[in-house]
């Protein structure tokens, strides 16, 4: 037992643990025969009660910990596999109800991103990004709980309500709101003298997540404010219509009530999309696109992880800087064919994703979609 607990429990504490975990029910409760009960090494060498994480530097018994069962961090797609990679081979200690330490792989409490859902990919397939024309009069539009089809920073607004105003001067503004979760604003301008160019600035305030990453228990509560700039350019080359769009952003993270995360540095983000389309005289259209979903390319978290205890009951730990840059870079190469059919349009599409979810070791993924759209 001294080896199991790495000599962090004194002989007296080990004996007390054996007494506390001994079987005392039924006939084993007869103190005249069994004294402290029937010794149970299995119970003595396994967590007693629900283990909890304590902050490094705290004292056992003098502070409340975070239950191990509810301590995890679920990563958004922009962070990919960054934290599991940073915590690879790193141990973290949790303490049971009797104060004994037990060690676990820290990366086991991170949940890497699953990437965009099938429903989100289908929405993007059915409604590919298109720049609206400059209106001749002021236009207003409201969408409740709108699906975000964007692959950039506005992908974070999925499920938020949108109110858009667009004017004949090429100026447009959109307000985003999702109760208790997010609010944001974008301002865009398309110069009348250069209608092929659009510039946009945006602000998003996430209250309960950081780039769609959510923490719980010892990882605390994450939030973040994002500022981003984007530019888009349209042009024609023969029968082809070409589009290019890029975004860069900076995220100012916040973390509270965490035993593990001390601070998170500002995060730099980016995304881009290149597209080409060719319409045909019969109404068909062929489209190609290459895009990178939103990705963090600089930033780190300062962590203080509990790694054990002293025999006097003080929690000891280690500090480290965990880079939040994913190991890979997802690139989506898509092709789509739209064909008129039965008073509507039949769409066939395929996407090949390399290093999906920004994970360098992940095998390429293929996605195929078929859709039909008609209006009456």
Regions found by a protein language model. Give the residues of each.
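Outer membrane beta-barrel translocator domains of Type V secretion systems
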Residues: 105-248, 360
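Hydrolase catalytic cores
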Residues: 1-32
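Secreted peptidase-domain scaffold signal
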Residues: 44-134
